[in-house]
Amino acid sequence: MATEAIVNDRKEIFGWAMYDWANSAFSTTVGTVFLGPYVASLARTAAEAAGTSTVSFFGIPVAPDSFLPYCISFSVGMQVLVLPILGAIADYSHLRKRMMQIFATIGALATIMMFLLTGGLWWLGGVLFIIANLSFGAAIVFYNAYLPDIASEEERDRVSSYGWAMGYMGGGILLALNLAFFIFSEDIGVPGDLAVRINLASAGLWWIGFAFFTWARLRPRHAAKALPAGETYVSIGFKQLKKTFSEVRHFPETMKFLLAYFLYNDGIQTVIAVAATFAAAPVIQGGLEQDQTTLTAVILMIQFMAFFGALFWGKLAGWIGAKQSVIVSLVIWAGVVIYAYGGLKGDSVTAQFFILGVFIALVMGGSQAISRSLFAQMIPRGKEAEFFAFYEISERGTSWIGPLVFGLANQIFGNLRIAILALIFFFIMGLILLPFVNVQKAIGDAKRYGENNSSGAQV
């Protein structure tokens, strides 16, 4: 039975936000901190043992530091094919919550299996990451699609920011525990590589464990529609997707925003995804190389500061408007990559790295939380999961163009500073496109479309 009329329920909103608390462990402990440097280290060892500068993945020579960025790109390429279909199925059926549960479980189990990464199994790290990241993105489609259902329009900026803030806090707490364990692991007789593997697996346990708070409090939404004769959920998913593509002309401003978001969020997600590899790589010029403890401490600081940053940007959006808030954040992001290219040198490099982290923390949560709530107002009722499937293609940890650009720039120039600077393209494109998005027209188009189709068949 549908419960669409119940909105702004504090218990349900808390349960919804707890999923951000749960799955952010994957983003921080796995995606941002430990997996990239660890897999790159295993791959470098394998390359050195073979007497080459690359490793072979299914016969393809790959630079060790480029391997995981390529895996990110491949996993998102898979999402481009799969997520829109899943979104269409979810909007047609009553399975939104169930599908969220299934993919969260698959992702968590793949993450737990990262404990097995030893010796020459660097390639398994890539395979498990692809499975986990694909599942992470699929579950987030259904999670985001709940936002218009659980929060009224005037509350969405606040609720979206609250979800992101909970994610930063949850991911930060586990990261703090993992950092403490990593620092003192040798003192208690645990080798460093084993400590990393335990930390990776802990993210999967955290993910699946705290997700039960979400399952207990999140209500099923949208009653199922009867399938037409001869149709299955898969076939109707393809047809709904085709219909969505044919109807995008009704939402030109929403599509303009989605294009801008696709570009600038690629930049944001790539900076986050490659930060650990960038800072820890021995080939960085100017003495930037950071040990794992310093690197993790900086990212931990970012996590906790981002909790307050996300809440601040929710307030800022109320003062100057959501679109203007995102534009301000993109200017700061552009400054971050410029400084990563030209700065971070000299005797104070560690202090500079912390200062750069402060600016990242300031904008990281705000640019994403406000983008999500803004997009939620631009889509018609009944098509939330379909539209959020397209949105998720460029969501956190699932960018594909950015990691590909970063990986290719590093492989071509052999310089990670040039690779990080190349990402400024995405922020510049966002700054160019966003001013042309008419937010009020987008909201009006979505409302009129929903009203015109409310008495008809599923839209």
Protein language model regions, located:
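Hydrophobic core of transmembrane alpha-helices in multi-pass small-molecule transporters
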Residues: 110, 121-139, 350-366
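Short amphipathic helix-loop junctions that connect adjacent transmembrane helices
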Residues: 30-65, 273-294
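C-terminal ends and interior cores of transmembrane alpha-helices
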Residues: 101-120, 331-347
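C-terminal transmembrane helical hairpin of 12-TM major facilitator-type secondary transporters
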Residues: 323-368
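Cytoplasmic membrane-interface "Motif A"-like loop-to-helix N-cap segments
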Residues: 90-106, 318-332
